[in-house]
């Protein structure tokens, strides 16, 4: 059996398994999908994941081999409304569970995170995703933003967050992906991301999860983080200790001798581990690296990977692997 056939068999077996548990994936258990219909639970799932770029009517005709009794568009919409919101997420997780991850150094999971926007069926009533007519579209269009988690060595997507384009928040998306990722026993995830994901809140979520991160940062953010500790060299590898707080009052700081380490997180900025009106403090230790990637160009990365096990050249190599998720979007 070819790999593609084996993969398809696994996918269909999981759909069949969910069909036996369809009450768990129905909005009205015991009522929805209780009658025999041409477009039952199993075919409804298979049809939607096999759809291509044609109209729904045309895709229905293809799926049912142009049979005269092909379900109508209305029938499809009626059946689709019966599905629970988590049905495809559950199928995605169950399907992935059949493929053990490939680890780096027999322990680490290299998980790249990146976002991309996609247009979908025009609906001006969906204000969270709709753009008015402009130079890109005379009729307007709708978009969603997807932030995906991709295993660089296994070449598989493991999870994703979908947001309406007008509520796009990549910091929140990555924090949620970190929180709900459940690594296999004996493994540790390394979340690798581009500079759009650089934030104290993302760093803290990974640390609280017992995970590692490797995230690129702009020059201005690196200098703001390091402050007066920013080395005047083209490359460096330094550890920075910071104490995060919600208050700007030095009188409320618990460690006056470490005043230069304090950074105030204003109320407008999300930080999950400091309530808005709290005097609490959150110490955080970060490793900041800068290395050349060309004659006059450099990269800055922030990580919590241990220096003894991950020297600077290895960090550079690991970050370079992040491009695997960029190319995966185009495959």
Please provide the spans of the model-predicted regions.
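Single, function-defining residue in the core of a domain
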Residues: 1-54, 62, 71, 75-83, ...
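Short alpha-helical "recognition helix" segments of helix-turn-helix
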Residues: 59-65
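Short Lys/Arg-enriched helix C-cap and helix-to-coil transition segments
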Residues: 87-100
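Conserved beta-strand elements of the Class I
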Residues: 109-111
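Short, flexible, glycine/charge-rich loop motifs used to bind or transfer phosphoryl groups or to couple energy/partner
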Residues: 66, 100-101, 179-182
């Amino acid at each position: 059996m070819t790999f593609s056939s084996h993969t398809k068999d696994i996918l269909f077996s999981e759909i069949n398994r969910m069909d036996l548990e369809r009450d768990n994936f129905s909005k009205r258990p015991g009522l929805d999908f209780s009658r025999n219909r041409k477009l039952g639970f199993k075919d409804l799932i298979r049809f939607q994941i096999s759809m291509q770029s044609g109209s729904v009517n045309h895709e229905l005709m293809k799926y049912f081999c142009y049979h005269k009794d092909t379900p109508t568009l209305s029938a499809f919409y009626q059946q689709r409304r019966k599905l629970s919101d988590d049905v495809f997420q559950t199928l995605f997780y169950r399907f992935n569970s059949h493929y053990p991850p490939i680890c780096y150094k027999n322990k680490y999971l290299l998980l790249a995170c990146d976002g991309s926007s996609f247009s979908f069926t025009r609906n001006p009533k969906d204000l969270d995703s709709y753009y008015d007519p402009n130079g890109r579209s005379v009729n307007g269009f709708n978009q969603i933003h997807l932030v995906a988690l991709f295993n660089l060595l296994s070449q598989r997507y493991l999870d994703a967050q979908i947001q309406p384009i007008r509520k796009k928040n990549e910091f929140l998306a990555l924090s949620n992906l970190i929180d709900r990722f459940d690594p296999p026993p004996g493994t540790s995830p390394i979340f690798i991301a581009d500079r759009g994901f650089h934030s104290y809140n993302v760093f803290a979520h990974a640390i609280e999860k017992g995970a590692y991160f490797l995230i690129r940062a702009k020059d201005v953010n690196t200098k703001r983080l390091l402050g007066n500790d920013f080395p005047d060299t083209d490359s460096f590898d330094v550890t920075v200790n910071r104490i995060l707080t919600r208050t700007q009052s030095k009188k409320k700081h618990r460690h006056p001798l470490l005043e230069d380490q304090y950074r105030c997180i204003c109320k407008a900025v999300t930080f999950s581990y400091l309530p808005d009106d709290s005097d609490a403090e959150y110490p955080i230790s970060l490793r900041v690296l800068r290395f050349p990637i060309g004659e006059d160009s450099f990269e800055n990365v922030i990580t919590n990977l241990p220096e003894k096990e991950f020297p600077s050249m290895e960090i550079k190599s690991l970050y370079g692997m992040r491009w695997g998720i960029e190319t995966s979007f185009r495959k």
